[in-house]
């Protein structure tokens, strides 16, 4: 059976990485509080790059040295699409997984969406935390505002951006279409990739399983729910 796994933040929680919508994702600019969904936008990157980069560094880059957990190692030989940008599936040895939302350890030139650009490693260790904002702006080659094809942008799909070939969307769609079963692990079903997968599952009559302690109930009859963590699931699946 061709089983496709689609994972979300719940899988990396065991590695000490907070879920995206957790309390530490909120950010204050002046007297105004911003949600993670407001911070993680192309508009914020363009209009307030110093705040965007400081938030991104605090929210993601500070966790860059965390290691994989048992679930990542269990998934290392599986057909996998992850929504997580932490790169832990690669560290666990999965050489063929798709990081559909990008990677924390990578960046690209700031470009018009859809244009081909090179993905390069982000030298996070060069950041001087004693002068954090200035150092981040230097790293991403931003003066007052990002400049197309001159400044750099973290390789992450933001909420007001769309999937392109840079994020392997064509290959991801192919894997969904070819699956006999799709197993969702630790995801809240609040992003487009899970909606896309469910549309394909319903169209092709694909079996679906959901692994989550408090799962989102899907409008589809062929779903088996495992009300448990991903770690608990792999322990009973071995």
Predicted regions span which residues?
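Conserved catalytic core of sirtuin-type NAD+-dependent deacylases
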Residues: 1-238
């Amino acid at each position: 059976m061709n089983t496709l796994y689609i994972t979300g933040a719940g899988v990396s929680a065991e590695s000490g990485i907070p879920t995206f919508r957790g309390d530490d994702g909120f950010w204050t600019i002046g007297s105004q509080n911003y949600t993670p969904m407001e911070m993680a936008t192309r508009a914020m990157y363009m209009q307030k790059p110093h705040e965007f980069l400081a938030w991104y560094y605090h929210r993601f880059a500070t966790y860059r040295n965390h290691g994989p957990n048992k679930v990542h190692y269990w998934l290392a030989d599986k057909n996998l699409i992850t929504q997580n940008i932490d790169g832990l599936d690669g560290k666990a040895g999965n050489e063929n997984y798709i990081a559909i939302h990008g990677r924390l350890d990578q960046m690209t030139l700031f470009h018009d969406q859809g244009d081909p650009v090179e993905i390069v490693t982000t030298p996070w260790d060069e950041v001087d935390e004693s002068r954090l904002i200035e150092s981040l702006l230097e790293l991403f080659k931003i003066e007052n505002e990002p400049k197309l094809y001159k400044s750099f942008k973290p390789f992450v799909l933001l909420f007001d951006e769309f999937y392109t070939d840079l994020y392997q969307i064509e290959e991801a769609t192919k894997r969904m279409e070819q699956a006999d079963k799709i197993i969702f692990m630790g995801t809240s079903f609040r992003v487009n990739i899970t909606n896309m997968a469910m549309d394909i599952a319903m169209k092709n009559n694909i079996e679906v399983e959901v692994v989550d302690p408090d799962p989102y109930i899907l409008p589809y009859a062929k779903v088996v729910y495992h009300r448990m963590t991903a770690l608990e699931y792999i322990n009973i699946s071995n």
